[in-house]
Amino acid sequence: MPVRAQRIQHVMQDTIINFYSTSDDYGDFSNFAAWPIKVDGKTWPTSEHYFQAQKFLDEKYREEIRRVSSPMVAARMGRNRSKPLRKNWESVKEQVMRKALRAKFEQHAELRVLLLATAPAKLVEHTENDAYWGDGGNGKGKNRLGYLLMELREQLAIEK
């Protein structure tokens, strides 16, 4: 690799790409971004709709979530504790998110290109609203969404 390319790659490794709002430069990485996904024969308006619905075993309630008008409403419905959560939710939630992300980035070529173009930068869901999927706003959160996107980016680069 030429020296200049090595320097550019080194700079990119130190680069952090923050995303959260769908209006951000990388807002399409948000689960609220309006990129429909088809999973298990059903079309979901956003990956957020799909993710939130998978918390529940009640098929009727899952369908209600799928049909709501916005990812914000889907997220609110996903926090509804009057409906029982799947007992194994904590152990499967990352697997569900992986499935949603893979569908989103495989089914939309322009998103796949955008994700691949971020390598090797660190992707961070920068929000104080979530310290599990995001960075907690102060960098101390787990940033699991960012890490799952980087994992997917690596897989897609290999499959290219």
UniProtKB/Swiss-Prot annotation:
Keywords noted in UniProt: Glycosidase, Hydrolase
Catalytic activity as recorded in UniProt: 2,5-diamino-6-hydroxy-4-(5-phosphoribosylamino)-pyrimidine + H2O = 2,5,6-triamino-4-hydroxypyrimidine + D-ribose 5-phosphate; 5-amino-6-(5-phospho-D-ribosylamino)uracil + H2O = 5,6-diaminouracil + D-ribose 5-phosphate
Pfam families (alphabetical): NADAR (PF08719)
EC number(s) from the headed UniProt entry: 3.2.2.-
Superkingdom of the source species: Bacteria
Gene3D superfamilies found in the cross-reference section: YbiA-like
Xref: InterPro entries: NADAR (IPR012816), YbiA-like_sf (IPR037238)
Molecular functions (GO terms): hydrolase activity, acting on glycosyl bonds
Function statement: Catalyzes the hydrolysis of the N-glycosidic bond in the first two intermediates of riboflavin biosynthesis, which are highly reactive metabolites, yielding relatively innocuous products. Thus, can divert a surplus of harmful intermediates into relatively harmless products and pre-empt the damage these intermediates would otherwise do. Helps maintain flavin levels. May act on other substrates in vivo. Has no activity against GTP, nucleoside monophosphates or ADP-ribose. Is Required for swarming motility.
Similarity comment: family membership: Belongs to the YbiA family.
Protein name in UniProt: N-glycosidase YbiA
Native organism: Shigella sonnei (strain Ss046)
